[in-house]
């Protein structure tokens, strides 16, 4: 493996690409081949200080720019993203590993997030009520917070950052972005395209790194709010540390999404839907289907079809269109998932399809689609977020048992039901504990103009991302009562 021509990514601070203050770096491999494609700096406190200081200086001017003018930058950015959509998709596949089809889908979802940001003037409109008392009018106004920060994961290196900084910036804030050290090249490209539309320096800053950068942002007195997406332990840490320091925090965390399959479902469509929800993006997404609760009446027929279709899924380099499952992000993650599979077998689950047997011509971090039957809630593979193409089947008596099973999980991000019964779907919608619910919808992640967040250990905070929640998170309200004598 040669690394002689592999570049080291830089930080974007105060309108320029600058080297990190620390010499420490981490290799960024292509998950499909294991070959180094970049080095990412592990920036430190000094880099965070410089980025926040730049954002704070820029805020004093940026907050006075009229909101329609701020939004015009988003319209221009939108065109840049559309013009470069294929390049962005190829870059996602290169450093994340997901298939090119999934990468193109992510690019489209990212574009939709920026489309939402172009509606900021409408979303920031306040409310007014005249004559609330004799000669007194009342109104509500929205203002930006100041310097805000975003900490984003590797699994959606385009969509999640675009949940955050376009909306925050259009609302009048300035932004410090800390993306995953596993996918720095896509972040570099997103910032470069934003720079090309002429965004004033300091409005958007990028600091690469790991825990030192996270702690620097959490503890910096000039950072007003932090948006985070990642694992449950880190989300809990970010929320507790950030709020203890007086910051507004939204922390989207882990998931164990369940799909409920009833006897009256459209069986073939349900099987294909579950396969896409469970195994696309190699299962490395917080909305992946991880458990199917299928009623006994249809269990054998459903599992027979699901097993046959799962065995057909090809595994390999995501740049090739014919592959359905790409590599996992790192060898260390693959090793962890393999241990979960071993635990499933040891604890009594029936392994119907073993993804450990997947082979590829390239030396990447490959794990094929894996399917378990006869899983119980006492098993580790039911309890933990695996973040992998591993699907567990639990057989249940009826809808009530399926709902109770789903609600037993400590996670509550998304849940889906497959049924032809409106009555059953309505009951499921009302009884299930999940932030996002799908009815014959494979992945219940709505468009960007709806809010996105889970419940229980899947989310820490009050306001989710996107939609009305998004604009409320990045702004504060002022309630004004006024009377005039002249």
From Swiss-Prot:
The active site is at 286 (nucleophile). NAD(+) binds at residues 154, 178, 181-182, 231, 385. The lineage of its organism: Bacteria, Bacillati, Bacillota, Bacilli, Bacillales. The gene is iolA2. GO terms for biological process: inositol catabolic process; thymine catabolic process; valine catabolic process. The keyword Translocase does not apply. It comes from Shouchella clausii (strain KSM-K16). It catalyses: 3-oxopropanoate + NAD(+) + CoA + H2O = hydrogencarbonate + acetyl-CoA + NADH + H(+); 2-methyl-3-oxopropanoate + NAD(+) + CoA + H2O = propanoyl-CoA + hydrogencarbonate + NADH + H(+). HAMAP family: IolA (MF_01670). CDD domains: ALDH_F6_MMSDH. Keywords: NAD, Oxidoreductase. This is Malonate-semialdehyde dehydrogenase 2. Belongs to the aldehyde dehydrogenase family. IolA subfamily. Disulfide bonds: none annotated. The keyword Oxidoreductase applies. Homotetramer. Its EC number is 1.2.1.27. It is an enzyme of class 1 (oxidoreductase). It holds the Pfam family Aldedh. Pathway: Polyol metabolism; myo-inositol degradation into acetyl-CoA; acetyl-CoA from myo-inositol: step 7/7. It comes from the Bacteria. GO terms for molecular function: malonate-semialdehyde dehydrogenase (acetylating) activity; methylmalonate-semialdehyde dehydrogenase (acylating, NAD) activity.
């Amino acid at each position: 493996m040669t690394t002689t021509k592999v570049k080291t990514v830089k930080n974007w601070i105060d309108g320029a690409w600058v080297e990190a203050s620390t010499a420490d770096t981490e290799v960024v491999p292509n998950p499909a081949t294991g070959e180094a494609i970049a080095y990412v700096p592990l920036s430190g406190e000094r880099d965070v200080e410089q980025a926040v200081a730049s954002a704070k200086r820029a805020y004093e001017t940026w907050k006075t720019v009229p909101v329609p003018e701020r939004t015009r930058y988003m319209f221009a950015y939108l065109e840049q993203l559309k013009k470069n959509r294929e390049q962005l998709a190829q870059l996602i596949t290169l450093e994340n590993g997901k298939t090119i089809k999934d990468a193109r889908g992510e690019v489209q979802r990212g574009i939709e997030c920026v489309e939402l940001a172009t509606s900021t003037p409408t979303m920031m409109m306040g409310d007014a009520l005249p004559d609330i008392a004799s000669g007194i009018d009342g109104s509500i106004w929205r203002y930006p917070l100041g310097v805000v920060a975003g900490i984003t994961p590797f699994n959606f290196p385009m969509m999640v950052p675009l949940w955050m900084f376009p909306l925050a910036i259009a609302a009048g804030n300035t932004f410090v972005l800390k993306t995953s050290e596993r996918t720095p090249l896509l972040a570099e490209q997103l910032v470069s395209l934003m720079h090309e539309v002429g965004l004033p320096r300091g409005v958007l800053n990028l600091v690469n790194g790991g825990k030192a950068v996270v702690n620097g942002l959490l503890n910096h007195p000039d950072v007003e709010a932090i948006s985070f997406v990642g694992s449950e332990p880190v989300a809990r840490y970010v929320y507790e540390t950030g709020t203890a320091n007086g910051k507004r925090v939204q922390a989207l965390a882990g998931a164990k999404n369940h799909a409920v399959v009833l006897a009256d479902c459209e069986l073939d469509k349900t099987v294909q839907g579950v396969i896409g929800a469970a195994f696309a993006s190699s299962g490395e997404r917080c909305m992946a289907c991880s458990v199917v609760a299928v009623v006994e009446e249809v269990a054998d027929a459903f599992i027979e079809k699901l097993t046959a279709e799962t065995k057909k899924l090809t595994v390999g380099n995501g740049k090739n269109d014919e592959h359905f499952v790409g590599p996992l992000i790192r060898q260390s993650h693959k090793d962890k998932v393999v241990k979960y599979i071993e635990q499933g077998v040891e604890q009594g689950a029936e392994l119907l399809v073993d993804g450990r047997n997947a082979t590829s011509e390239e030396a990447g971090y490959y794990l094929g689609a894996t399917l378990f039957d006869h899983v119980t809630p006492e098993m580790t593979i039911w309890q933990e977020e695996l973040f992998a193409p591993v699907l567990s089947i639990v057989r249940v008596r009826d809808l009530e048992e399926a709902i109770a099973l789903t609600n037993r999980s400590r996670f509550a991000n998304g849940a889906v039901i497959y049924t032809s019964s409106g009555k059953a779907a309505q009951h499921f919608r009302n009884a299930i504990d999940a932030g996002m619910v799908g009815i014959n919808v494979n992945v219940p992640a709505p468009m960007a103009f709806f809010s996105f967040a889970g419940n229980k250990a899947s989310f820490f905070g009050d306001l989710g991302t996107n939609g009305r929640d998004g604009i409320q998170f990045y702004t504060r309200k002022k309630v004004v009562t006024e009377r005039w004598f002249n």
